[in-house]
């Protein structure tokens, strides 16, 4: 369940609430729990939002568990907006999530692998960069990675 935790060898893993739903077959809608994840060890915290629509759950996570150093925030699979809004964050909402979490860094996820919705495959990172600029945020602290790319600077700071 949300907020339960498992601790092993100095690592704490905790599921957190997010706005979404679950379904694996035609007969099991919302029979299992969906979640984000906070993973904490020594002096570093990583938050994985997973599949999520924008909600106050992100602020609630910070209130309970503190700000993550690094967050993986979805930026894709958002069009048509009227249908996808409750379950998938768009790039502009991803910037709001980043601010809600108070993360030091973020990586945009949930885009560019499969054509899931109507927006062009390469649109989410372009819109993210624009949204960051509008918000006055440096695109070097919230970025997208190419498949296989690493970002070692996050762990070095």
Where are the regions that the model predicts?
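Core dinuclear metal-dependent hydrolase active-site scaffold
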Residues: 1-66, 130, 147-157
